[in-house]
Amino acid sequence: MARSTVLTPEDEATPAVRHARWQDYFQLMKPRVMSLVVFTALTGLLAARTPIHPLLGAVAVLCIAIGAGASGALNMWYDADIDAKMRRTRGRPVPMGLVKGEEAATLGVVLSLLSVMLMGMAINWLAAGLLAFTIVFYAVVYTMWLKRWTAQNIVIGGLAGALPPAIGWAAATGHAPLNAWLMVLIIFLWTPPHFWALSLYISTDYAKAGVPMLPVVKGAKETRKQILLYSLALIPVCLAPAFTGLGGWLYLAVSGLGGLVFLTLAVRVFRSLAGEASDPRPADRDLYEVGEAAAKRGKPVGDAKHARNLFAFSILYLFALFAALLAEAVLGLPILNLHVLELPL
């Protein structure tokens, strides 16, 4: 797919009314995504339950935050053409003309080098290597290749967003055992139903931008099926830390109850097309517009309602899982000793 950094006629017709501010450069770093990355990395660092000097711990988290910001800046530089075509992203600094593409790219490269080198010299090179791999995988493999060429883009590309707990654990201990990778697996399996729920009700947005998200390529019915399948795989994996010497009773309760809600919402999404004779593609049915109109009335309906509910709860569920692990580590709560599957710490 050819790539162009030229703004749309609509954007070009509206000149920038101000120079870039520091907030615009900060937005390049995707602060909301960065906050989730930092949170899961911090959980990994503390869940290792290995003493680490507070200053070194802070430096490690800072490096991970900078690395996440670097990935975001590189993504916004390369995806400026796509972002300009989508309602959800056209207000970003580069397509708006507030920050030049080359400035975003330069910021991303500089922050990437800074975060990896600082992590290696101040913490350890295993954590630095994992951080470097994460940045390259997200900025190059996902952004420049997978996102534009395959409907499995967020499945494979989700590895980049799943790695921060392992980076945090490696920063604290100098190694990354199976329990660290179990946290990675949780995020990896959580990513597809999370993003596919979003893509269900903005599928036309993706279609107009030429992004081959699953609903665009395979349709809504197949997407709902995949959401349910990944949800069925996710729930037992989320329960696993309680049986591997990683989580305690608090985590078991949160993962169990939250998992039931998550699975219930996924089933509702799956059943929302039951009995339909056809599987309308985005060109025939704009779920984004349907959902927006319904939301304004205060009564989201049908596809938009169920997809929105799952998308919103998926964020809460992931946060609750890692918050439970974090709370148990900080408070020194005992882990369960069920001896079902003992993984090395």
From Swiss-Prot:
<keyword id="KW-0350">Heme biosynthesis</keyword>
<keyword id="KW-1133">Transmembrane helix</keyword>
<dbReference type="InterPro" id="IPR044878">
    <property type="entry name" value="UbiA_sf"/>
</dbReference>
<feature type="transmembrane region" description="Helical">
    <location>
        <begin position="154"/>
        <end position="174"/>
    </location>
</feature>
<dbReference type="GO" id="GO:0048034">
    <property type="term" value="P:heme O biosynthetic process"/>
</dbReference>
<feature type="transmembrane region" description="Helical">
    <location>
        <begin position="226"/>
        <end position="246"/>
    </location>
</feature>
<keyword id="KW-0472">Membrane</keyword>
<feature type="transmembrane region" description="Helical">
    <location>
        <begin position="247"/>
        <end position="267"/>
    </location>
</feature>
<dbReference type="GO" id="GO:0008495">
    <property type="term" value="F:protoheme IX farnesyltransferase activity"/>
</dbReference>
<dbReference type="InterPro" id="IPR030470">
    <property type="entry name" value="UbiA_prenylTrfase_CS"/>
</dbReference>
<feature type="transmembrane region" description="Helical">
    <location>
        <begin position="126"/>
        <end position="146"/>
    </location>
</feature>
<feature type="transmembrane region" description="Helical">
    <location>
        <begin position="33"/>
        <end position="53"/>
    </location>
</feature>
<keyword id="KW-0812">Transmembrane</keyword>
<feature type="transmembrane region" description="Helical">
    <location>
        <begin position="315"/>
        <end position="335"/>
    </location>
</feature>
<comment type="pathway">
    <text>Porphyrin-containing compound metabolism; heme O biosynthesis; heme O from protoheme: step 1/1.</text>
</comment>
<dbReference type="Pfam" id="PF01040">
    <property type="entry name" value="UbiA"/>
</dbReference>
<keyword id="KW-1003">Cell membrane</keyword>
<dbReference type="GO" id="GO:0005886">
    <property type="term" value="C:plasma membrane"/>
</dbReference>
<protein>
    <recommendedName>
        <fullName>Protoheme IX farnesyltransferase</fullName>
        <ecNumber>2.5.1.141</ecNumber>
    </recommendedName>
</protein>
<comment type="function">
    <text>Converts heme B (protoheme IX) to heme O by substitution of the vinyl group on carbon 2 of heme B porphyrin ring with a hydroxyethyl farnesyl side group.</text>
</comment>
<keyword id="KW-0997">Cell inner membrane</keyword>
<feature type="transmembrane region" description="Helical">
    <location>
        <begin position="182"/>
        <end position="202"/>
    </location>
</feature>
<feature type="transmembrane region" description="Helical">
    <location>
        <begin position="54"/>
        <end position="74"/>
    </location>
</feature>
<comment type="similarity">
    <text>Belongs to the UbiA prenyltransferase family. Protoheme IX farnesyltransferase subfamily.</text>
</comment>
<keyword id="KW-0808">Transferase</keyword>
<dbReference type="InterPro" id="IPR006369">
    <property type="entry name" value="Protohaem_IX_farnesylTrfase"/>
</dbReference>
<feature type="transmembrane region" description="Helical">
    <location>
        <begin position="105"/>
        <end position="125"/>
    </location>
</feature>
<dbReference type="InterPro" id="IPR000537">
    <property type="entry name" value="UbiA_prenyltransferase"/>
</dbReference>
